[in-house]
């Protein structure tokens, strides 16, 4: 059993879903970023989804682009990110840790080397935002060689063939998009996703987590009621970081209570 299957089994036994926050590592600074992750875990996060800062994030709206800019300005590099993950893993040995990043960062030092480094740091899964399932073979092979779960996006308008492929290649969880477009809490999650969820179930896909535009507890409740195994919230977390980055005590209190409210909705 890996950390994801353990986490989902534990949640299922308690009739709960997963709350998964996303943050960009190093935003607004390295020490602050580690404190933010502690606050989210203390608030009840079941898994973490972590981004490496990147200068040209295609799928991200302005909020997460701002996080990338702040993290890069703080001197965050991929090497820094792996060192941070080692610290997070040492502190939370059972917590599933996923990476959400772009192919350029994986290619930079060679695909195999990237996954080896990720495994050594304690990473459980990798989602490459700009590599569709159809083009993922070298990434999947490198991930599986290291025992890392390759994660795939299931878009709301996907064909049955795409969903079948996502289900067969993916491990850990399935990233279910609530809508097409760029990320952002202002672009509220759109339901219904019943047809996508039932297709994923039919194809035995890993547990679906709904992402994109998840900003409030009611949306978490809706996602789980629709059949998702949980929800991922990124822009809503990063918005709070942006607003309160100059008042860390207030920010950490706010993030912990946000995570608690989102978790309570599962």
UniProtKB/Swiss-Prot annotation:
Recorded metabolic or biological pathway in which this protein acts: Amino-acid biosynthesis; L-tryptophan biosynthesis; L-tryptophan from chorismate: step 5/5
The region annotated as signal peptide is none
Gene3D superfamilies given in the database record? Aldolase class I
Tell me yes or no: is Amino-acid biosynthesis among this UniProt entry's keywords.
yes
Q: Name one GO molecular function term.
A: tryptophan synthase activity
Q: Pfam families this protein is in?
A: Trp_syntA
**InterPro entries, per database record:** Aldolase_TIM (IPR013785), RibuloseP-bd_barrel (IPR011060), Trp_synthase_alpha_AS (IPR018204), Trp_synthase_suA (IPR002028)
Domain of life of the organism encoding this protein: Bacteria
Active site, UniProt feature: 49, 60
Cysteine pairings via disulfide bonds: none
**Leading EC class:** lyase
PROSITE patterns linked to this entry: TRP_SYNTHASE_ALPHA
> Catalytic activity, per the record?
(1S,2R)-1-C-(indol-3-yl)glycerol 3-phosphate + L-serine = D-glyceraldehyde 3-phosphate + L-tryptophan + H2O
Q: Keywords for this entry?
A: Amino-acid biosynthesis, Aromatic amino acid biosynthesis, Lyase, Tryptophan biosynthesis
- Cellular component GO terms, alphabetically? cytosol
**Catalytic activity, EC:** 4.2.1.20
Could you tell me what this protein does? Answer: The alpha subunit is responsible for the aldol cleavage of indoleglycerol phosphate to indole and glyceraldehyde 3-phosphate.
What family does this chain come from, according to its entry? Belongs to the TrpA family.
Quaternary organization: Tetramer of two alpha and two beta chains.
In its UniProt entry, what is this protein called? Tryptophan synthase alpha chain
User: Which organism's genome codes for this protein?
Assistant: Shewanella amazonensis (strain ATCC BAA-1098 / SB2B)
């Amino acid at each position: 059993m890996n950390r994801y299957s353990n986490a989902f089994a534990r949640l299922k036994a308690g009739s709960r879903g997963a709350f998964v926050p996303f943050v960009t590592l190093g935003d607004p600074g390295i020490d602050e970023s580690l404190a933010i992750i502690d606050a989210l875990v203390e608030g009840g996060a079941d898994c973490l989804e972590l981004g490496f800062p990147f200068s040209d994030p295609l799928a991200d709206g302005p909020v997460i682009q701002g996080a990338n800019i702040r993290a890069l300005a703080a001197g965050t590099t991929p090497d820094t990110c792996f060192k941070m993950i080692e610290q997070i893993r040492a502190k939370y040995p059972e917590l599933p840790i996923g990476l959400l990043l772009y192919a350029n960062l994986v290619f930079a030092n060679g695909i195999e080397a990237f996954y080896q480094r990720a495994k050594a740091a304690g990473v459980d899964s990798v989602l490459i935002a700009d590599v569709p399932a159809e083009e993922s073979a070298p990434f999947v092979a490198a991930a599986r060689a290291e025992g890392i779960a390759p994660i795939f996006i299931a878009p709301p308008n996907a064909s049955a063939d795409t969903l079948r492929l996502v289900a067969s290649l993916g491990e850990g969880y399935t990233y279910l998009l609530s809508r097409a477009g760029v990320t952002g809490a202002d672009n509220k999650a759109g339901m219904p996703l019943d047809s996508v969820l039932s297709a994923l179930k039919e194809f035995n896909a890993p547990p679906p987590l709904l992402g994109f535009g998840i900003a409030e507890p009611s949306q978490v409740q809706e996602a789980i009621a629709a059949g998702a195994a949980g929800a991922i919230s990124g822009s809503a977390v990063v918005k709070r970081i942006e607003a309160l980055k100059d008042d860390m005590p207030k920010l950490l209190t706010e993030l912990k209570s946000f995570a608690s409210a989102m978790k309570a909705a599962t």
